[in-house]
Amino acid sequence: MDDEEVAESWEEAADSGEMERRLEEKLRISQKERLSSGSSSRSPMRTAIVIQDDSLPAAPPPQIRILKRPSSNGSLGSSALQTRPSPQVKSLAQREAEYAEARKRILGSATPDDTPQERPNSDRSPRGSSHTLSEENRPGNHVVRQPAGPDGTQGFHHQRR
């Protein structure tokens, strides 16, 4: 084996016929061993010898097939499309009606005019005016308690100097 010439690449060995020559030599050697072991009755038990050579090409790798998805005629695709609702383009009036319905369900009022953020500032008294009872008793004012200051007076309605 030391006197064998080793090719630089398997492509060069295949082109020059070196691989075929080595394969034929190994087959001849294995046939001679079979004949010699078959004629001699010394070894009653025969053993199989598997010769693997790195210079021989290995078995081809398993092929991977990339399959396409079935068209819309497939049973899986059509059932998935039937269960999913189709997106509908709604008009502005439909969207506003749904919004008002959801708002009424959640907040209890259908119009956004009832919110304190959107009230005009004219309902509120000017900053420097005195505190009146009518402001506390207004129907829109839902104050549970008025905070008291450190000296027992009403804290937020006390005028600063």
From Swiss-Prot:
Q: Which residues carry this modification: Phosphoserine?
A: S125
Comp. bias intervals (Basic and acidic residues): 18-35, 93-104, 116-126
The SUZ-C domain extends over: 116-160
| Sequence segments annotated as region (Disordered) | 1-161
Query: Which keywords, in A-to-Z order, does the entry hold?
Result: Phosphoprotein
What Pfam families does this protein map onto? SUZ, SUZ-C
The residue ranges of the SUZ domain are 42-111
- Which segments show compositional bias classed as Acidic residues? 1-17
Q: Does 4Fe-4S appear among the keywords?
A: no
Q: Which family does it belong to?
A: Belongs to the SZRD1 family.
Transmembrane residue ranges: none
Which gene is the coding source of this polypeptide chain? szrd1
UniProt entry tagged with the keyword Iron-sulfur: no
Q: According to the UniProt entry, which residue ranges have a biased composition of type Polar residues? A: 70-91
Could you name the domain of life of the organism this protein comes from?
Answer: Eukaryota
Q: What is this protein called?
A: SUZ RNA-binding domain-containing
